[in-house]
A protein has these predicted regions:
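Membrane-interfacial entry segments at the cytosolic side of transmembrane helices
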Residues: 2-10
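Membrane-interface segments at or immediately adjacent to transmembrane helices
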Residues: 11-112
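Solvent-exposed soluble domains appended to multi-pass membrane proteins
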Residues: 78-266
Length: 266
């Protein structure tokens, strides 16, 4: 009996001891430090968030950054779905939108600074032939894909937008949709859009920074999945950025658990 206990303890203790030894000898060096501003605008998601216009949300960001020297900051980070006016902005026309132009005008004063933020986007389809499996039927001959996305500006390659791809079941994703929708039909539309399925993307994306590093735009629930986060690193990410809507959790342990996951992933 004692032999079995001793063997079990050794099996557990030896890897821990090796890990601690490696940790003590490991030094993390960087020749190019990144200066980051992480914003928490503290917008109540239950009473304010979705009634606030995008231009007002941008003004809050600018006001929060006003006391700081933007020329010394490499990256400004805003929360998940921070720009969430209405149903979102059209993905097809995003770069010609008023919000995009306003962000571009703001950052043109700070050529060394990049801005990454959460945003709601959508894409419409008017034909059975072009609609996707994730698109939501809004009315006759109109289907819409909704995205919980991350956006970086300015960007220096084709990767400017990433769509959240690990969705919260029941909030962003309807399970067994092919079975449930024919049964409930338009009842789904009467729930305020809360059960609209979000669209995703197949591969992880990293956003390159001016200083040569690359960030993983991890959105909320995605951080729970270790191997999923690893895919960001395989895509070239060297910095993990986790954007969340922690205010949804109110005064619970949820936001603290999110922080613990973030430290674990790092």
């Amino acid at each position: 009996m004692l032999k079995k206990v001793a063997t079990t303890l050794l099996v557990v203790a030896i890897p821990i001891a090796i890990s601690l030894a490696i940790f003590q000898k490991t030094t993390i060096q960087t020749n190019t430090p990144i200066s980051v501003a992480v914003l928490q605008p503290n917008v109540d998601p239950y009473t304010e968030k979705y009634n606030q216009k995008n231009e007002e949300s941008l003004a809050v960001v600018q006001q929060m950054m006003a006391p700081y020297n933007m020329n010394s900051i490499d990256l400004v980070i805003a929360p998940e779905t921070y720009f969430a006016e209405g149903a979102g902005l059209s993905l097809r026309n995003f770069e010609t939108s008023t919000l995009y132009k306003s962000i571009d005008d703001w950052l043109s004063n700070y050529p060394k600074t990049q801005f990454v933020t959460g945003i709601q986007l959508f894409k419409t389809y008017t034909s059975e032939d072009t609609k996707t499996a994730t698109s939501n039927l809004i009315r006759e001959q109109l289907w819409v894909d909704f995205y919980n996305s991350a956006f970086i500006h300015p960007s220096f390659d084709e990767n400017t937008i990433y769509h959240k791809s690990k969705l919260v079941v029941g909030v962003e994703n309807t399970p067994y949709r092919s079975i449930i929708e024919p049964i409930l039909g338009n009842v789904l539309l009467d729930l305020g859009g809360t059960v609209f399925t979000k669209a995703t993307q197949e591969y992880r994306t990293s956003f390159p920074l001016i200083k040569g590093a690359s960030i993983a735009p991890i959105i909320c629930y995605e951080s729970v999945y270790g191997s999923f986060v690893t895919d960001y690193v395989r895509a070239g990410a060297t910095i993990l950025v986790i954007m969340t809507n922690d205010a949804w959790w109110s005064n619970t342990q949820g936001h603290k658990q999110h922080l613990s996951y973030a430290k674990l992933r790092a």
